[in-house]
Every structure is written in structure tokens, then in C-alpha cells.
């Protein structure tokens, strides 16, 4: 099996550059991506088996692996949810599939978003993990616009092993993530 393009770039260029930039003693101290979690909330549509199956197929096409269903933990009358009923779909990507997905996300999917100005650098938590949302899952070329019954959103969480969020930001910036610059609005 071939090594993904982004993983080769990470090992040969990005990791040594981060090591020099932050003055780490060895390459294992540099920030690295551990996993990517994608979540698609379905809400009340989850009770319809056709819609659920269609969304499962779309998530499988986008990520390359079968999604797992998530369930509501509590019943909330205002949201018409019942404990144990399906809330959405979730996929966790690691290793090669993770790098392949990131490559497609940054170079193909994000540029296809209409009026896209960049990702907000405010999506980092105190541990350095980056979270952002996409309003349309059809930006991925694997999903057919005509076949999609409804345009759905995706939550993407990039779990990064890093000392702080500045190191995480530097890692994603070197991976060509299109962040909004300070002066741009």
C-alpha cells in the first residue's frame, strides 16, 4: 500500500521544520495529528430509514469507512428526542485514511465552498485540538449533488497531540490549512 502524499510531506518536510521552529530536541516532540472525528447530526430525520441509509452512504464515500450511529443520551420534550433513539452518524479516521481525508479536505473540498474566505483560527481548544463545521457535505467530490436528498452539515474535529495551541496552529498552517489572516475579515 502506498503512503499518502500528505504523510510523506509531513515526515520529510513539516516535522523537521517544526522541530527547528520550536527548538525541540528530537522529532517525537513535534505536534502530530492523532485522529480526525467527523460527525453528522440528523435530528428528526434520523427516524426515517431511507434518509439514514442515504447519509450513511454519503459519509462512507467521504471518509472511506462505514459510520457508526450515535444515540441521544437524554429525552428532551422540546426537541422531540427520546433516549436511545438515533441522533446522527460518526466516523473516526486514523493513520493513512486520516492523511488521505485531510489532503482531500484542504486541496479539493474547502476550495469548492462558495464565498470561502478561510477557516477561523478561533476553533482551537486549550489542548490544541481544532474543531470546525462545514454547512454543506456536498463540497466533497465523492458525493453526488443530484443524489443528495438534503444538504447536511458536518462537524470535523482534528485531535492533535501538541504542547499548546500555538504548536497545533503551526502544524495545520504548514499543512496548508486556509486560515483567515489577522487583517482579513
Segments (PLM) and residue ranges:
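Ribosome-associated RNA-binding proteins
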Residues: 1-185
Amino acid at each position: 500500500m502506498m503512503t499518502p502524499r500528505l504523510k510523506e510531506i509531513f515526515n520529510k518536510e513539516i516535522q523537521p521544520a517544526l522541530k527547528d521552529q520550536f527548538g525541540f530536541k528530537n522529532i517525537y516532540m513535534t505536534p502530530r495529528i492523532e485522529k480526525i472525528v467527523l460527525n453528522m447530526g440528523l435530528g428528526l430525520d434520523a427516524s426515517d430509514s431511507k434518509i439514514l441509509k442515504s447519509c450513511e452512504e454519503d459519509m462512507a464515500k467521504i471518509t472511506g469507512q462505514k459510520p457508526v450511529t450515535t444515540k441521544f443520551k437524554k429525552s428532551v420534550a422540546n426537541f422531540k428526542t427520546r433516549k436511545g433513539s438515533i441522533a446522527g452518524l460518526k466516523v473516526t479516521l486514523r493513520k493513512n485514511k486520516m492523511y488521505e481525508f485531510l489532503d482531500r479536505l484542504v486541496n479539493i473540498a474547502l476550495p469548492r465552498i462558495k464565498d470561502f474566505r478561510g477557516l477561523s483560527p478561533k476553533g482551537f481548544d486549550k489542548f490544541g485540538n481544532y474543531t470546525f463545521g462545514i454547512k454543506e457535505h456536498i463540497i466533497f467530490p465523492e458525493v453526488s449533488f443530484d443524489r443528495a436528498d438534503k444538504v447536511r452539515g458536518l462537524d470535523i474535529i482534528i485531535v492533535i497531540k501538541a504542547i499548546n495551541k500555538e504548536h497545533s496552529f503551526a502544524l495545520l498552517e504548514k499543512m496548508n490549512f486556509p486560515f483567515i489572516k489577522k487583517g482579513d475579515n
